Amino acid sequence: MTLRILALAAGVGALAAPAAAQQEPTLEFAFEEIVGLGQATAPGDTARGGRLIIPITGGTFEGPEIKGTIVPGGWDWQLRRADGCTDVEADYFLKTDDGVVINVVNKGVICPGEGGAFRPVRTHPVFEAPRGKYDWLSQNAFVGTLELAPPENGPAVRIRIYRVR
């Protein structure tokens, strides 16, 4: 037990040490999703705000290292806050074209900007991928952009995912 604590302390100490040449993070495009949405359900106001639940009905995704479909059955849990912003938290699964299933939990905040128009929406997806070809998803930080998908996609959103380097 003492050895484990010492190893943990040494690891934390290494993180705290200043880096010789710290680089600013950059973004690298990972993939784009078109996420189909179903009819929203509004269970009502809670102590935290107005809740809205939107089913994820399917979709597609594609990028340089990954491609596949979005598995129907996920949900987007939204919470309208007193300040006019909406917290979004989507939990769903990707299925790659070679059959690998990957969990996504994607959170963000939608807030009105000047004149009531919405500001660009940024998200922070977290992936749980099995070990192997796609474990890079579990081993990196990501950010996303969220917007309505083109009308030909039906009720859907477009999410562009970027790996933080």
Show the residue positions of the predicted features.
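Bacterial N-terminal signal peptides
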Residues: 5-16
